[in-house]
């Protein structure tokens, strides 16, 4: 959304958006091999200088109306400020967990290891990850299909924030006991102020 108002001197130009909104069709797994069409929403922003003018309400209402008219039975969104979307019928469906591993001391895993993990070539992971995810997606209730660009992101071929490749990203693949790939991870080492050894 771009402003039609005159732009004062030194302000961001009219060619810069004052609000963004992205939506696309996808698929939501219900479990037991069943899935339904889903309408996904992301990248919803309103510039603080244009807040409280009804932009979010108009964008969301128009988009959800079009999704409903197109026959989508469910809509889902990613949001950094989830509380503002309750008025549109959205609520928390899942939570995120983050794990930090202290690698300075000896790390002992209590569960028995199953299969193996190998460092992987990022381009190979870009090809392999969609196949691994498809098996997970079909078996996991609540899973949403990934976009094509996602595989570039998890393999370091593209970073949304940087707008370019991310060559420092590393990948690894988990192989089951029969040697079939059944999981992957992408990660990077963050710079530190020094090493505590």
Residue ranges of predicted features:
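Conserved beta-strand in the GNAT
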Residues: 3, 10-26, 40, 45, ...
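Short, conserved catalytic-motif segment at the N-terminal edge
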Residues: 26-35
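Exposed loop/turn and edge beta-strand positions of beta-sandwich/beta-sheet ligand-binding modules
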Residues: 35, 40, 168
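A short, internal acetyl-CoA/4′-phosphopantetheine-binding micro-motif in the GNAT/acyltransferase core
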Residues: 41-51, 80, 175, 197
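Conserved acetyl-CoA-binding loop-helix of GNAT-fold acetyltransferases
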Residues: 43-46, 52-69
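Conserved active-site alpha-helix within GNAT-family acetyltransferase domains
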Residues: 68-73, 79-98
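Short secondary-structure capping/junction motifs at helix and strand boundaries
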Residues: 70-78, 139-146
């Amino acid at each position: 959304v771009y402003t039609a108002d005159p732009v004062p001197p030194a302000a961001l130009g009219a060619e810069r958006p004052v609000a963004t909104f992205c939506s696309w069709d996808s698929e939501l797994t219900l479990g037991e091999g069943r899935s339904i069409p889903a309408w996904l929403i992301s990248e919803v922003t309103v510039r603080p200088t244009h807040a409280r003018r009804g932009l979010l309400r108009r964008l969301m209402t128009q988009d959800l109306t079009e999704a409903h008219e197109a026959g989508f039975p469910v809509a889902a969104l990613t949001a950094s400020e989830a509380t503002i979307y309750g008025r549109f019928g959205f609520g928390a469906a899942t939570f995120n967990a983050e794990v930090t591993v202290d690698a300075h001391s000896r790390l002992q895993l209590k569960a028995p290891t199953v299969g193996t993990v190998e460092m992987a070539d990022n381009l190979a992971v870009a090809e392999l990850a969609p196949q691994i995810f498809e098996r997970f997606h079909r078996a996991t209730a609540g899973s949403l299909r990934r976009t094509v660009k996602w595989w570039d992101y998890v393999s370091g071929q593209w970073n949304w924030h940087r707008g370019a490749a991310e060559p420092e990203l590393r990948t690894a693949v988990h192989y089951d006991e029969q040697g079939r790939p059944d999981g992957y991870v992408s990660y990077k080492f963050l710079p530190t102020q020094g090493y505590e050894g």
